[in-house]
């Protein structure tokens, strides 16, 4: 597990948490988003901080994209616009998300996150299941939206292209 971590994130930074498998990267993200996980030490976050989280797990996603947008209280037009930028065809808008590939499901979570008005975006393995072309599309979206981002990812190229700061644990 990780030990003696101290860092801050300024507005507009994209911070990559690096470490070996099992080093506590995902656990750290879960602590930051407020999950009740047994730990020692203190996690400080600004009061009224709004966080948008992209989980590693996409297995529970189902329903149409319109239903998903409504259930998550996000603007459907903006959501679908972002998905179009991630190479979704109009035919996919009518399909059940449970039938999407792992990469398509991850894109759904990323698009949802970018639709949320948050101070901090916390993404756990955003390029999991994502091919190179899709990774580049996500990089372009991050340049366009410029969110303050804390993320964990094992794709070194993505990390080099996106991160403005790296924290090794």
For each feature predicted by the language model, list its residue ranges.
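ABC ATP-binding cassette signature C-motif
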Residues: 1-169
